Regions:
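N-terminal structural segment of carbohydrate-active enzymes
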Residues: 14-79, 173
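Active-site-adjacent "subsite" loops/lids of carbohydrate-active enzymes
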Residues: 23, 31, 35-52, 115, ...
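Hydrophobic faces of well-ordered beta-strands that scaffold small-molecule active sites
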Residues: 26-30, 69-71, 124-126, 192-194, ...
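Active-site clefts of carbohydrate-active enzymes
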Residues: 30-32, 249-275, 317, 321-362
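The substrate-binding groove and active-site-proximal loops of carbohydrate-active enzymes
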Residues: 35-48, 87-107, 159-177, 219-233, ...
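Polysaccharide-binding and catalytic clefts of secreted carbohydrate-active enzymes
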Residues: 60, 66-67, 74, 146, ...
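Aromatic-lined carbohydrate-binding/catalytic grooves of carbohydrate-active enzymes
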Residues: 64-104
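Substrate-binding cleft of secreted/luminal carbohydrate-active enzymes
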Residues: 284-310, 326-413
Length: 413
């Protein structure tokens, strides 16, 4: 495959005026695991403070002409919404199925967020992690006693220090479909969203413990890697059907690790990168198949690298993904958290990474997205980094890049 490349620098080309007003996704991830973004630790168990914090974020996004959030509601097989299937999240109330400060469930965070976001013209893409049961410093002892983890221990495996659903089991796929169906049925969400955590990132010297499952349920496969990819393919295909059968207008999006495969691994389809992780080979996520089959509506690769990075160049990857969309939408994940406002730390950055000590790296990437012609917007991770206005990023968005509001590219009902 020939990789498209810009013939002129994104900084030297003029952005067409229409690019500022045409449909463009302008999103931000709101991470709840380990209280990364919301609620803050000060607001754990405090419904009033949680609501105030959410309103502050949404008001800021509205003022900056953002039009989408990706709200994490199931970070560790738990719920930041009212659920009969999984426990109230410890990140919301302090421990799984814990009590609020007043002893009641005073509000439904997902319902509240949908209502308040939609008032402001902001879409809500609901973010779930499919297989992770512990994370963010959790241990087995933090899992609620009535969790499905204890009701069906045969569904779970331990890898490293963490626990996961076993992706090779039909029962696990059904459980995940039931969780998603419950959300789609009961909430006015605009999309279901998964990130890069399918099979977990590899641990050196340790194999994911599913050999017995493979031996018991090979489904015609004789290669465990192909079988694992098929496990992930099956759940994506089934979730697509689960969502669309209920509400055809609700979209299904994936935000994968930024490299599908390196060109040295796959000379015909790989990107000109030298990444240490590859979706297809390490996370068993065949994103291109999902796009080709129409199982997902958009892809938001996490391109958290700078323009010009030798092993994973933002521009090369932007162009690669834009040439492998199969007619679906591309929203690029960008990384405000990598901007370095501390002058002393910025001075220590080496090579192309020096870009993160400059105020314009994210702005350059947004301009490059627009010039690409096939990219329909970006999503920023995480929202708290954006809110901190690193190197004046918020100011640049407000006065220049996001000066005018934009409709979303989302297919409406």
């Amino acid at each position: 495959m020939v990789i498209a490349a810009s013939t002129l620098s994104a900084e030297t080309q003029r952005i067409p005026e229409e690019a500022l007003t045409q449909p463009e996704m302008r999103g931000a991830w709101i991470a709840t695991v380990a209280n990364i973004d919301w609620p803050t630790k000060a607001a754990i168990g405090d419904a009033d403070l949680q609501q105030k914090e959410m309103i502050t974020m949404l008001d800021t996004l509205q003022a900056l002409h953002f039009n989408m959030i990706v709200f994490q509601v199931r970070p560790t097989a738990d719920a930041l919404y009212q659920s009969k299937m999984e426990p109230v999240s410890s990140w919301l109330v302090g421990k799984q199925n814990g009590m609020w400060t007043d002893g009641t469930m005073p509000y439904d965070p997902l319902e509240f967020t949908c209502n308040e976001a939609h008032k402001r013209g902001i879409e809500v893409h609901v973010w779930l992690n499919p297989y992770r049961v512990t994370g963010g410093g959790m241990t087995k002892g933090d899992i609620a006693a009535d969790h499905v983890f204890y009701q069906h221990p045969e569904w779970f495996v331990k890898y490293g220090k963490q626990y996961y659903f076993n992706p090779g089991l039909d029962e696990v796929r059904q459980w995940l479909n039931d969780v998603v169906a419950d959300i789609v049925d009961r909430y006015e969400v605009d999309a279901i969203h998964f990130d890069d955590y399918f099979y977990p990132y590899r641990i050196a010297g340790e194999e994911f413990p599913d050999a017995e499952t493979f031996a018991a349920y090979p489904r015609g496969f004789d290669n465990i890697d192909d079988w694992r990819r098929n496990n992930t393919n099956l759940v994506i295909e089934e979730l697509h059907r689960t969502i669309k059968d209920r509400k055809p207008w609700v979209e299904f999006g994936i935000s994968p690790f930024g490299v599908w495969r390196n060109i040295t691994t796959d000379p015909e389809r790989g990107s000109k990168t030298k990444a240490g992780v590859q979706n297809y080979d390490d996370l068993y996520a065949d994103i291109l198949l999902w796009l080709e089959m129409g199982w997902i509506d958009y892809v938001a690769p996490q391109l958290y690298w700078e323009i010009g990075k030798q092993v994973a160049d933002y521009e090369i990857l932007l162009n690669w993904w834009s040439e492998n969309l199969y007619g679906k939408k591309l929203y690029v994940g960008v990384a405000p958290y990598r901007l370095e406002p501390n002058a002393e730390k910025a001075a220590k950055l080496k090579g192309t990474a020096k870009a993160w000590g400059q105020p314009n790296e994210i702005c350059r990437q947004i301009r490059m997205n627009r010039l690409n012609g096939k990219c329909s917007g970006c999503i920023m991770y995480p929202i708290h980094s954006l809110m901190e206005n690193p190197l004046g990023l918020k100011d640049s968005l407000r006065t220049t890049l996001f000066r005018e509001p934009a409709e979303t590219p989302t297919t409406k009902k």
